[in-house]
From Swiss-Prot:
It is found in: Peroxisome membrane. The gene is APX5. Its cofactor is heme b. Belongs to the peroxidase family. Ascorbate peroxidase subfamily. Its main location: membrane. The chain crosses the membrane at residues 251-271. This is L-ascorbate peroxidase 5, peroxisomal. Keywords: Calcium, Heme, Hydrogen peroxide, Iron, Membrane, Metal-binding, Oxidoreductase, Peroxidase, Peroxisome, Potassium, Transit peptide, Transmembrane, Transmembrane helix. It is a single-pass membrane protein. Pfam families: peroxidase. GO terms for cellular component: chloroplast; mitochondrion; peroxisomal membrane; peroxisome; plasma membrane. Binds one cation per subunit; probably K(+), but might also be Ca(2+). Binds 1 heme b (iron(II)-protoporphyrin IX) group per subunit. The active site is at residue 39.
């Protein structure tokens, strides 16, 4: 069903944002909320124009798939907020939860444009397999219409949370403080394996691949640059399968312009660093 993004809907979005901020802070559930947003959006197929950020993960058929183990808790948390703001679509709610999860843990502000439609059935779509390497990551992310720089930036989201044996057959956090959003994921990658910290095959692929590696080095060195890149890529992820309304509030338009400028800065820096190494 179409979402009418009028003034009242925008007010509901802001109230929803406040309630999500309070819930995520009080429950320490930022990692699982970020995972929910990613898994709902990550089913997108750019060629087929199917899947994406459409709230379909609320359906049992999708929620019960092996790669979504544990997310029923995040869906339940969101239901508490949905009960207060029934007009807000599930698709908007789940993506806003991911945005807020990053912000309340110290990460960058991510522009959010509401208006996503809810799916009426579960999506198909493969998500990353932690036992695979760089070619697997490229295949999945290119299916979504995302690029190498998006793969590396979004992988930095592993700075939040930990893997659980009962969900993924892996156990442990990626960083020393799994409730703080920073660039430590990349710092730890460059340090090599550390007792008690997790490095999956998909993580190590970022080091081994010659196109991924420069981004890892840059983000480990410059947290501000990582934050800018992450905000760009997270916004893209949150809008997979969604065409934002043409008429949006000026504040949102200004934020989007800022993201575009930041993207240019990141790309320029990568090229500059590469040219320096080539001299």
């Amino acid at each position: 069903m179409a979402v009418n993004v009028d003034a009242e809907y925008l007010k509901e979005i802001e109230k929803t944002r406040r309630d999500l901020r309070a819930l995520i802070s009080s429950r320490n559930c930022a990692p699982i909320m970020l995972r929910l947003a990613w898994h709902d959006a990550g089913t997108y197929d750019a060629k087929k124009k199917t899947g994406g950020a459409n709230g379909s993960i609320r359906f049992k058929e999708e929620l019960n798939r092996p790669h979504n183990k544990g997310l029923e808790k995040a869906v339940a948390f969101c239901e508490e907020v949905k009960a207060k703001h029934p007009r807000v679509s599930y698709a908007d709610l789940y993506q806003l939860a991911g945005v807020v999860a990053v912000e309340v843990t110290g990460g960058p502000a991510i522009p959010f444009t509401p208006g996503r439609k809810d799916a009426d059935s579960a999506d198909d779509g493969e998500l990353p397999n932690p036992n695979e390497g760089a070619s697997h990551l490229r295949t999945l992310f290119s299916r979504m219409g995302l690029l190498d720089r998006d793969i590396v930036a979004l992988s930095g989201g592993h700075t939040l949370g930990r893997a659980h044996k009962e969900r993924s057959d892996f156990e442990g956090p990626w960083t020393q403080d799994p409730l703080k959003f920073d660039n430590s994921y990349f710092v730890e990658l460059l340090k090599g394996e550390t007792p008690g910290l997790l490095q999956l095959k998909t993580d190590k692929a970022l080091l081994d691949d010659p196109k991924f590696h420069p981004f890892v080095k840059l983000y480990a060195k410059d947290e501000d640059m990582f934050f800018k890149a992450y905000a760009i890529s997270h916004k893209k992820l949150s809008e997979l399968g969604f065409n934002p309304p043409r008429r949006i509030p000026s504040a949102v338009t200004q934020q989007t312009l800022g993201i575009a400028v930041a993207a240019a800065v990141v790309i320029f820096t990568i090229c500059y660093e590469a040219s320096r190494r080539g001299k």
